[in-house]
Amino acid sequence: MQTEWNFDAVNSAQEIILKPGKYKLECWGARGGATGTPLSDGFYYGKGGYCSGELTLRKKTALYVYVGFDGKKGSQFNGAGYCGSATGGGATDIRLVDGNWDNPQGLLSRIIVAGGGGGTRDRYTAGSGGGLKGGIGRDFNGSPSHGGTQFEGGKGKYDDGSLDGSFGKGCAYPNPSAGSGSGGGWFGGAGGNGGSFGSGGGSGYVLTKDSYKPPGYTPTSEYYFDNVVMTTGGNTTVVGNYSDGRAKITLLQALPFLTVSSYNSTQATFKVDHTDPTLLTKIEYFIDDVLKETITTDLTTEKTINYTLEDNALHTLKIVVTDSNNATAEKVLSISKNIMPLPEDVNLNDISTKLIEVNAGFKTGKTSII
Protein backbone atom coordinates (compact mmCIF):
# COMPACT_ATOMS: atom_id res chain seq x y z
CA MET A 1 0.00 0.00 0.00
CA GLN A 2 1.36 3.41 -0.96
CA THR A 3 2.14 5.62 2.04
CA GLU A 4 4.08 8.51 0.46
CA TRP A 5 3.36 10.82 -2.47
CA ASN A 6 5.84 13.37 -3.88
CA PHE A 7 5.06 16.30 -6.19
CA ASP A 8 7.52 18.28 -8.32
CA ALA A 9 7.01 21.56 -10.19
CA VAL A 10 4.67 21.33 -13.17
CA ASN A 11 2.64 24.08 -14.81
CA SER A 12 -0.75 22.84 -13.58
CA ALA A 13 -2.66 21.36 -10.66
CA GLN A 14 -1.81 17.82 -9.52
CA GLU A 15 -4.78 15.92 -8.11
CA ILE A 16 -4.60 13.29 -5.40
CA ILE A 17 -7.54 11.45 -3.82
CA LEU A 18 -6.87 10.33 -0.26
CA LYS A 19 -8.79 7.80 1.79
CA PRO A 20 -9.62 8.63 5.41
CA GLY A 21 -6.51 8.59 7.56
CA LYS A 22 -3.99 10.76 9.35
CA TYR A 23 -1.51 12.43 7.00
CA LYS A 24 1.49 14.73 7.16
CA LEU A 25 1.42 17.42 4.45
CA GLU A 26 4.65 19.27 3.57
CA CYS A 27 5.25 22.16 1.16
CA TRP A 28 8.47 23.82 0.03
CA GLY A 29 8.32 27.13 -1.87
CA ALA A 30 10.63 27.86 -4.82
CA ARG A 31 13.79 29.98 -4.74
CA GLY A 32 13.78 33.46 -6.27
CA GLY A 33 15.74 34.20 -9.44
CA ALA A 34 18.87 36.34 -9.66
CA THR A 35 20.69 38.20 -12.40
CA GLY A 36 23.54 40.66 -12.81
CA THR A 37 26.94 40.50 -11.13
CA PRO A 38 26.95 38.52 -7.88
CA LEU A 39 29.24 38.89 -4.91
CA SER A 40 32.05 36.36 -4.54
CA ASP A 41 29.82 34.08 -2.45
CA GLY A 42 26.95 34.19 -4.95
CA PHE A 43 23.61 35.91 -5.38
CA TYR A 44 21.49 36.85 -2.41
CA TYR A 45 18.28 35.43 -3.85
CA GLY A 46 15.48 34.55 -1.47
CA LYS A 47 15.11 30.89 -0.54
CA GLY A 48 11.75 29.17 -0.61
CA GLY A 49 9.86 28.63 2.63
CA TYR A 50 8.77 25.40 4.33
CA CYS A 51 5.45 24.58 6.01
CA SER A 52 4.07 21.31 7.34
CA GLY A 53 1.27 19.96 9.49
CA GLU A 54 -0.71 16.83 10.33
CA LEU A 55 -4.25 16.46 9.02
CA THR A 56 -6.84 13.79 9.85
CA LEU A 57 -9.32 13.11 7.05
CA ARG A 58 -12.61 11.43 8.02
CA LYS A 59 -13.82 10.89 4.45
CA LYS A 60 -12.38 10.31 0.99
CA THR A 61 -10.98 13.69 -0.06
CA ALA A 62 -9.63 15.18 -3.30
CA LEU A 63 -6.71 17.57 -2.85
CA TYR A 64 -4.98 19.68 -5.49
CA VAL A 65 -1.25 20.38 -5.32
CA TYR A 66 0.35 23.44 -6.98
CA VAL A 67 4.17 23.57 -7.01
CA GLY A 68 6.12 26.73 -7.87
CA PHE A 69 9.18 27.11 -10.13
CA ASP A 70 12.62 28.55 -9.38
CA GLY A 71 12.46 32.25 -10.31
CA LYS A 72 15.45 31.84 -12.64
CA LYS A 73 13.08 30.00 -15.01
CA GLY A 74 10.96 33.14 -15.38
CA SER A 75 7.59 31.49 -14.65
CA GLN A 76 4.72 33.37 -13.02
CA PHE A 77 3.05 30.10 -12.02
CA ASN A 78 1.53 30.18 -8.53
CA GLY A 79 2.06 33.82 -7.78
CA ALA A 80 5.65 34.64 -8.72
CA GLY A 81 6.25 38.26 -9.72
CA TYR A 82 7.71 38.20 -13.26
CA CYS A 83 10.92 40.11 -13.94
CA GLY A 84 13.02 38.08 -16.39
CA SER A 85 15.74 36.06 -14.67
CA ALA A 86 15.08 38.04 -11.48
CA THR A 87 11.51 36.66 -11.24
CA GLY A 88 10.36 35.62 -7.78
CA GLY A 89 9.93 32.01 -6.75
CA GLY A 90 6.49 30.44 -7.04
CA ALA A 91 4.60 29.35 -3.95
CA THR A 92 3.72 25.72 -3.29
CA ASP A 93 0.29 24.96 -1.88
CA ILE A 94 -2.37 22.30 -1.38
CA ARG A 95 -6.00 23.30 -1.86
CA LEU A 96 -9.54 21.95 -2.12
CA VAL A 97 -10.59 23.60 -5.42
CA ASP A 98 -8.70 23.10 -8.68
CA GLY A 99 -8.50 25.16 -11.87
CA ASN A 100 -6.00 27.81 -12.94
CA TRP A 101 -3.55 28.66 -10.19
CA ASP A 102 -5.02 32.18 -9.84
CA ASN A 103 -8.66 31.06 -9.76
CA PRO A 104 -10.12 33.13 -6.86
CA GLN A 105 -12.11 30.17 -5.50
CA GLY A 106 -8.97 28.06 -5.61
CA LEU A 107 -6.87 30.63 -3.77
CA LEU A 108 -9.58 30.84 -1.10
CA SER A 109 -9.48 27.05 -0.65
CA ARG A 110 -5.75 26.71 0.17
CA ILE A 111 -5.13 24.83 3.42
CA ILE A 112 -1.31 24.86 3.46
CA VAL A 113 1.12 27.18 1.61
CA ALA A 114 4.90 27.62 1.50
CA GLY A 115 6.03 31.02 0.20
CA GLY A 116 8.39 31.57 -2.72
CA GLY A 117 11.61 33.53 -2.30
CA GLY A 118 12.11 37.01 -3.74
CA GLY A 119 14.16 37.67 -6.88
CA THR A 120 17.18 39.99 -6.95
CA ARG A 121 19.67 41.81 -9.17
CA ASP A 122 23.40 42.10 -8.57
CA ARG A 123 24.48 42.03 -4.94
CA TYR A 124 21.28 43.06 -3.21
CA THR A 125 19.50 40.79 -0.77
CA ALA A 126 16.07 39.33 -1.52
CA GLY A 127 13.69 38.08 1.16
CA SER A 128 13.12 34.37 1.65
CA GLY A 129 9.68 32.79 1.48
CA GLY A 130 7.68 31.98 4.59
CA GLY A 131 7.02 30.60 7.00
CA LEU A 132 4.78 32.82 9.03
CA LYS A 133 5.90 35.80 6.97
CA GLY A 134 8.16 36.44 4.01
CA GLY A 135 11.61 37.95 4.41
CA ILE A 136 12.53 41.54 3.49
CA GLY A 137 14.41 42.48 0.30
CA ARG A 138 16.78 45.49 0.24
CA ASP A 139 18.03 47.99 -2.34
CA PHE A 140 21.41 49.74 -2.55
CA ASN A 141 20.26 52.27 0.07
CA GLY A 142 18.96 49.56 2.39
CA SER A 143 15.34 50.51 1.69
CA PRO A 144 13.01 47.57 2.34
CA SER A 145 10.74 45.61 0.06
CA HIS A 146 8.61 43.76 2.60
CA GLY A 147 7.53 40.15 2.58
CA GLY A 148 3.95 38.97 2.72
CA THR A 149 2.32 38.39 6.12
CA GLN A 150 -0.64 36.37 7.35
CA PHE A 151 -2.95 39.33 6.75
CA GLU A 152 -1.66 41.32 3.77
CA GLY A 153 0.77 41.49 0.88
CA GLY A 154 4.26 42.90 1.30
CA LYS A 155 4.55 46.69 1.08
CA GLY A 156 6.80 48.08 -1.64
CA LYS A 157 8.85 51.25 -1.93
CA TYR A 158 6.21 53.25 -3.79
CA ASP A 159 3.39 54.90 -1.85
CA ASP A 160 0.91 54.26 -4.66
CA GLY A 161 1.00 50.52 -3.91
CA SER A 162 2.16 49.60 -7.41
CA LEU A 163 4.84 47.26 -6.04
CA ASP A 164 2.76 45.74 -3.23
CA GLY A 165 2.01 42.03 -3.07
CA SER A 166 -1.57 40.75 -2.79
CA PHE A 167 -3.52 37.63 -1.82
CA GLY A 168 -1.81 34.70 -3.52
CA LYS A 169 0.26 36.92 -5.83
CA GLY A 170 3.66 38.55 -5.84
CA CYS A 171 4.54 41.72 -7.72
CA ALA A 172 7.33 43.02 -9.94
CA TYR A 173 8.73 46.22 -11.40
CA PRO A 174 6.90 46.92 -14.71
CA ASN A 175 10.11 46.82 -16.77
CA PRO A 176 11.44 43.21 -16.79
CA SER A 177 14.94 44.43 -17.60
CA ALA A 178 15.12 46.32 -14.30
CA GLY A 179 14.03 45.69 -10.74
CA SER A 180 13.02 42.24 -9.52
CA GLY A 181 9.97 40.10 -8.84
CA SER A 182 8.70 38.99 -5.45
CA GLY A 183 7.78 35.54 -4.21
CA GLY A 184 4.29 34.10 -4.42
CA GLY A 185 2.62 32.91 -1.24
CA TRP A 186 -0.42 33.05 1.01
CA PHE A 187 0.16 36.76 0.49
CA GLY A 188 2.84 37.72 -2.04
CA GLY A 189 5.88 39.83 -1.24
CA ALA A 190 6.62 43.31 -2.58
CA GLY A 191 8.46 43.74 -5.88
CA GLY A 192 11.77 45.57 -6.27
CA ASN A 193 11.91 48.95 -8.00
CA GLY A 194 14.09 49.85 -11.00
CA GLY A 195 17.82 49.31 -10.81
CA SER A 196 19.39 46.85 -8.39
CA PHE A 197 16.91 45.71 -5.80
CA GLY A 198 15.94 42.58 -3.88
CA SER A 199 12.24 41.73 -3.61
CA GLY A 200 10.28 40.41 -0.65
CA GLY A 201 9.35 36.78 -0.06
CA GLY A 202 5.81 35.44 0.01
CA SER A 203 4.26 34.27 3.26
CA GLY A 204 3.32 30.71 4.14
CA TYR A 205 0.09 29.47 5.73
CA VAL A 206 -1.27 26.46 7.59
CA LEU A 207 -4.97 26.25 8.48
CA THR A 208 -5.62 25.90 12.22
CA LYS A 209 -8.32 26.96 14.65
CA ASP A 210 -6.46 30.21 15.31
CA SER A 211 -5.17 31.02 11.81
CA TYR A 212 -6.47 33.99 9.84
CA LYS A 213 -9.40 33.24 7.51
CA PRO A 214 -9.98 35.99 4.92
CA PRO A 215 -13.48 36.91 3.68
CA GLY A 216 -14.77 34.19 1.36
CA TYR A 217 -12.44 31.50 2.73
CA THR A 218 -14.12 28.11 2.27
CA PRO A 219 -12.30 25.29 4.15
CA THR A 220 -14.01 24.29 7.41
CA SER A 221 -12.77 22.99 10.75
CA GLU A 222 -12.50 19.43 9.37
CA TYR A 223 -9.27 20.60 7.66
CA TYR A 224 -7.56 22.05 10.74
CA PHE A 225 -3.93 20.94 11.11
CA ASP A 226 -2.00 19.85 14.20
CA ASN A 227 1.77 19.86 14.90
CA VAL A 228 2.39 22.77 12.56
CA VAL A 229 5.90 23.83 11.46
CA MET A 230 6.51 27.06 9.51
CA THR A 231 10.09 27.98 8.52
CA THR A 232 11.09 31.06 6.53
CA GLY A 233 13.77 30.08 4.00
CA GLY A 234 13.34 26.37 4.80
CA ASN A 235 13.84 25.10 1.23
CA THR A 236 17.58 24.56 0.80
CA THR A 237 17.38 21.78 -1.80
CA VAL A 238 19.13 22.49 -5.12
CA VAL A 239 18.76 20.08 -8.07
CA GLY A 240 20.59 20.84 -11.32
CA ASN A 241 21.33 24.42 -10.20
CA TYR A 242 17.62 25.07 -9.66
CA SER A 243 15.59 25.09 -6.49
CA ASP A 244 11.99 24.53 -7.54
CA GLY A 245 9.28 24.02 -4.99
CA ARG A 246 7.99 20.59 -4.05
CA ALA A 247 5.34 18.94 -1.92
CA LYS A 248 5.04 15.67 -0.03
CA ILE A 249 2.15 13.79 1.58
CA THR A 250 2.84 10.94 4.01
CA LEU A 251 0.30 8.56 5.53
CA LEU A 252 0.89 8.48 9.29
CA GLN A 253 -2.04 6.34 10.41
CA ALA A 254 -4.55 4.26 8.47
CA LEU A 255 -8.18 4.64 9.64
CA PRO A 256 -11.51 2.85 9.15
CA PHE A 257 -14.53 4.58 7.66
CA LEU A 258 -18.22 3.82 7.30
CA THR A 259 -20.91 4.99 4.87
CA VAL A 260 -24.64 4.38 5.46
CA SER A 261 -26.57 4.42 2.18
CA SER A 262 -30.11 3.90 3.56
CA TYR A 263 -32.03 3.02 6.71
CA ASN A 264 -35.60 2.78 8.01
CA SER A 265 -37.53 1.18 10.86
CA THR A 266 -36.73 -2.39 9.73
CA GLN A 267 -33.28 -2.39 8.10
CA ALA A 268 -30.12 -0.42 7.28
CA THR A 269 -27.63 -0.74 4.42
CA PHE A 270 -24.01 0.35 4.83
CA LYS A 271 -20.45 -0.21 3.61
CA VAL A 272 -17.18 -0.27 5.53
CA ASP A 273 -13.69 0.42 4.19
CA HIS A 274 -10.24 1.33 5.46
CA THR A 275 -7.12 3.13 4.30
CA ASP A 276 -5.58 -0.36 4.59
CA PRO A 277 -8.48 -2.87 4.44
CA THR A 278 -6.30 -5.70 5.81
CA LEU A 279 -6.39 -3.99 9.22
CA LEU A 280 -10.17 -4.26 9.66
CA THR A 281 -11.22 -6.64 12.47
CA LYS A 282 -14.95 -6.32 13.18
CA ILE A 283 -18.26 -4.53 12.71
CA GLU A 284 -20.78 -4.25 15.55
CA TYR A 285 -24.27 -2.84 15.61
CA PHE A 286 -26.35 -1.80 18.60
CA ILE A 287 -30.05 -1.03 19.09
CA ASP A 288 -30.65 1.32 22.01
CA ASP A 289 -27.08 0.60 23.20
CA VAL A 290 -27.65 -3.17 23.25
CA LEU A 291 -25.22 -5.17 21.08
CA LYS A 292 -27.17 -7.12 18.46
CA GLU A 293 -24.46 -8.62 16.23
CA THR A 294 -20.70 -8.74 15.66
CA ILE A 295 -19.48 -9.31 12.09
CA THR A 296 -15.91 -10.51 11.46
CA THR A 297 -15.91 -11.74 7.83
CA ASP A 298 -16.21 -10.05 4.42
CA LEU A 299 -15.93 -6.72 6.18
CA THR A 300 -15.60 -4.53 3.08
CA THR A 301 -18.66 -5.89 1.23
CA GLU A 302 -21.92 -3.94 1.41
CA LYS A 303 -24.08 -5.11 4.32
CA THR A 304 -27.81 -4.97 5.06
CA ILE A 305 -28.86 -5.59 8.65
CA ASN A 306 -32.45 -6.31 9.73
CA TYR A 307 -33.95 -5.52 13.11
CA THR A 308 -37.28 -5.35 14.93
CA LEU A 309 -38.21 -2.18 16.80
CA GLU A 310 -41.02 -1.63 19.28
CA ASP A 311 -43.91 0.59 18.20
CA ASN A 312 -44.58 3.99 19.78
CA ALA A 313 -40.92 4.49 20.65
CA LEU A 314 -37.80 6.38 19.65
CA HIS A 315 -34.75 4.21 18.95
CA THR A 316 -31.00 4.52 18.38
CA LEU A 317 -29.09 2.44 15.83
CA LYS A 318 -25.31 2.58 16.25
CA ILE A 319 -22.84 0.90 13.87
CA VAL A 320 -19.17 0.66 14.93
CA VAL A 321 -16.21 -0.57 12.85
CA THR A 322 -12.87 -1.38 14.53
CA ASP A 323 -9.38 -2.12 13.21
CA SER A 324 -6.38 -3.97 14.65
CA ASN A 325 -5.04 -0.74 16.18
CA ASN A 326 -8.37 -0.23 17.99
CA ALA A 327 -9.14 2.78 15.81
CA THR A 328 -12.90 3.07 15.29
CA ALA A 329 -15.46 4.76 13.08
CA GLU A 330 -19.13 4.90 13.97
CA LYS A 331 -22.50 6.17 12.81
CA VAL A 332 -25.43 6.86 15.15
CA LEU A 333 -28.84 7.02 13.48
CA SER A 334 -32.21 8.13 14.80
CA ILE A 335 -35.20 5.91 14.01
CA SER A 336 -38.83 6.26 15.07
CA LYS A 337 -41.30 3.39 14.97
CA ASN A 338 -45.00 4.28 14.63
CA ILE A 339 -44.85 7.26 16.92
CA MET A 340 -48.41 8.43 17.71
CA PRO A 341 -50.36 6.53 15.02
CA LEU A 342 -53.73 8.32 15.20
CA PRO A 343 -57.06 7.65 13.47
CA GLU A 344 -58.62 10.12 11.07
CA ASP A 345 -61.19 11.32 13.65
CA VAL A 346 -58.49 12.11 16.21
CA ASN A 347 -59.30 14.62 18.96
CA LEU A 348 -57.29 16.45 21.59
CA ASN A 349 -57.96 13.80 24.23
CA ASP A 350 -56.47 11.14 21.91
CA ILE A 351 -53.35 13.25 21.35
CA SER A 352 -52.98 13.81 25.08
CA THR A 353 -53.23 10.07 25.71
CA LYS A 354 -50.56 9.30 23.10
CA LEU A 355 -48.20 11.89 24.55
CA ILE A 356 -48.58 10.25 27.95
CA GLU A 357 -47.67 6.90 26.35
CA VAL A 358 -44.53 8.38 24.77
CA ASN A 359 -43.55 9.95 28.08
CA ALA A 360 -43.93 6.58 29.78
CA GLY A 361 -41.72 5.05 27.10
CA PHE A 362 -38.94 7.51 27.92
CA LYS A 363 -39.19 6.63 31.61
CA THR A 364 -38.70 2.93 30.82
CA GLY A 365 -35.53 3.43 28.85
CA LYS A 366 -36.48 4.78 25.41
CA THR A 367 -34.31 7.87 25.79
CA SER A 368 -32.50 8.07 22.47
CA ILE A 369 -33.75 9.81 19.34
CA ILE A 370 -32.49 8.49 15.98
What label would you give each PLM region?
Residues 45-146:
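Secretome/extracellular-domain signature
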Residues 271-279, 323:
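Extracellular acidic, Ser/Thr/Pro-rich low-complexity tracts
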Residues 67, 321-323:
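Conserved structural position at the C-terminal beta-strand
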Residues 327-339:
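Edge beta-strands of extracellular beta-sandwich domains
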